[in-house]
Swiss-Prot record:
Gene Ontology CC terms, in alphabetical order: cytoplasm
Protein name: Aspartate/glutamate leucyltransferase
Pfam families: ATE_C, ATE_N
Function: Functions in the N-end rule pathway of protein degradation where it conjugates Leu from its aminoacyl-tRNA to the N-termini of proteins containing an N-terminal aspartate or glutamate.
Taxonomic lineage of the native organism: Bacteria, Pseudomonadati, Pseudomonadota, Gammaproteobacteria, Lysobacterales
EC number(s) stated in the UniProt entry for this protein: 2.3.2.29
Length: 251
């Protein structure tokens, strides 16, 4: 299978075999994957985001399940975004934190936080055994133009504050893509996942980028409900991006 990549050639697509669904335990999933060996992959990636694809490591994929279309690509049109009351409270609650964008280069501190998060969120699932190699393969990859958005406690005596969260973010000419966010489990009350997205939106606004891609939203899935709380949300129907009105409860 191939898709039109430019005026000269096509980019090959591969379909994976069926595998366990990462969202519904009673379903099977499969994906479309852009040719990972194509040297143009980095150049075509911005367009692939607009086609509903997503990056994991060096793979750019999109769900393509035989009997399920639950995974809906979503993005935020940042110029039209306005935080709701809950999101404003989140910003206020975390105004003491220090946010900075750094190179996508693993540090021991980031790796320790990543492993702590996986043990909390995915105990016994295999991911909780990830080390430095898996960190680099999953989050950084070999060709992506990524950055790490770090969220820290305030500095103490000119030393950096404790690292609370990292939002792995891909940067393209016109958009940011939220790849993965991990945070200190004991700081869950701060809603750092939501706070990270709000910071990515502000980052995109500062740099005049049009969208922040949030990956996939699944209607009725508890872990995906938070995405519906964001205004200016758009969903991809396979051909076009359409407005998806925010829902205060996220359902």
């Amino acid at each position: 299978m191939a898709i039109h990549a430019d005026t000269h050639d096509d980019l090959r697509l591969f379909q994976t075999g069926e595998h366990a669904c990462g969202y519904w335990s009673d379903r099977r999933a499969r994906d479309l994957v852009l040719d990972p060996h194509d040297p143009r992959l980095g150049a075509i990636y911005p367009q692939a985001l607009a086609w509903g694809f997503r990056r994991s490591g060096d793979l750019v994929y999109r769900p393509h399940c035989e009997r399920c279309r639950a995974c809906v690509p979503v993005r935020i049109a940042v110029d039209a975004f306005h935080p709701d009351r809950s999101q404003r409270r989140c910003l206020t609650r975390n105004q003491d934190l220090v946010v900075r964008v750094v190179a996508a280069e693993r540090t021991d501190e980031q790796l320790a936080l990543y492993r702590q998060y996986l043990k909390y969120r995915h105990p016994g699932g295999g991911m909780d055994e990830h080390g430095a190699t898996e960190f680099d393969q999953f989050l950084i990859g070999g060709w992506s133009h990524g950055r790490f958005l770090e969220i820290r406690e305030p500095a103490i005596a000119h030393l950096p504050g404790r690292l609370l969260a990292v939002a792995v973010t891909d940067v393209t000419e016109h958009a940011l893509s939220a790849v993965y966010t991990f945070y200190a489990p004991e700081a869950a009350a701060r809603s750092l996942g939501t706070f990270a997205i709000l910071q990515q939106i502000q980052w995109a606004q500062r740099e005049r980028r049009a969208h922040v891609y949030l990956g996939y939203w699944i209607e009725g899935h508890a872990k995906m409900n938070y995405k519906r709380r964001f205004s200016a949300l758009e969903a991809y129907d396979g051909r076009h991006w359409c407005d998806l009105p925010a829902h205060p409860s996220g359902t």
